[in-house]
Amino acid sequence: TITDLAENNQVPIIFFNRELVTEDLERWSELYYVGADASQSGVLEGEIAADAFKKNADIDKNGDGICQYVVLEGEAGHQDSIVRTEYSVNTMVEKGVETEKLGYAIANWNRAQAQTKMAALLTQFDGKTGQKCDVAVGNNDDMALGAIDALKASDIPKESWPGVVGIDGTDEGIEAVKNEEMLGTVYNDKEGQAREMLNLAFVIATDGDKSDIPLIDGKYVRTPYHKLTLENIEESE
């Protein structure tokens, strides 16, 4: 494997974006990960959805007090995708929202795939059975935007759209929040991660003092996520 080759040749590796499972990162002392905590992104996404559901009665399309939701998931087996889905849904429940999963689809982090998958999901929720989708949970902003594309292409009026939430805080995602097409997004501090990777790489390359690096367990550098909704979207500017 790459990690075996790196260890055999004494070449440290800094991983980012896609987090290795703990067992793999522990295989050698010079393997590091810089990124955000996927569980935190899921928690914050769940909080956005739960807060909106409790504050805005219009989100509960059939008025049953239950948040019927669909999930657009990233790559199958991707650690971040699994964690984001689990924590977003569990957080809604912990915030006192009763939930019902109507469906899910793997869209591989891709906007076009998400549009196709969301369009297929929407055909299942025409109200004839009393089931209507209240919230669409996207593992990232691109898939959330794909869900919005599907809603725009449907004959569903905007006031009847499900609430859509995403993760990453991309420029287009932030614009969708401003336009009230998304309930909110969870901002991923990519600039902070780039700085931390550079700092860590410099310290490793120069055999410097790692005490200046905010390492967790000697291997992880975490940058915090934060919520962006219409109430605080100006913070993104």
Go through each PLM region and give its residues.
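Hinge/cleft segment of the Venus flytrap/periplasmic-binding protein
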Residues: G65-Q68, L72-A76, D80, T91, ...
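Flexible loop/hinge segments that line or gate small-molecule binding clefts
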Residues: I2-Q40, L44, D58-Q68, T170-K178, ...
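Hydrophobic alpha-helical segments within soluble ligand-binding/sensing domains
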Residues: Y33-D64, A114-Q115, G169-G173, D189-D209
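Hydrophobic alpha-helical
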Residues: T1-Q10, Y87-S88, L102-E175
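Exported/periplasmic ABC-transporter solute-binding proteins
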Residues: C133-V135, D149-E191, R195, N199-D217, ...
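Short, solvent-exposed amphipathic alpha-helices that sit
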Residues: S41-E45, Q79-E98, Q113-K117, G146-A150
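Solvent-exposed loop/turn segments at secondary-structure junctions
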Residues: E19-E23, S39-Q40, E75-Q79, I106-R111, ...
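Short beta-strand elements in bilobed, periplasmic/extracellular small-molecule ligand-binding domains
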Residues: Q68-V71, V93-R111
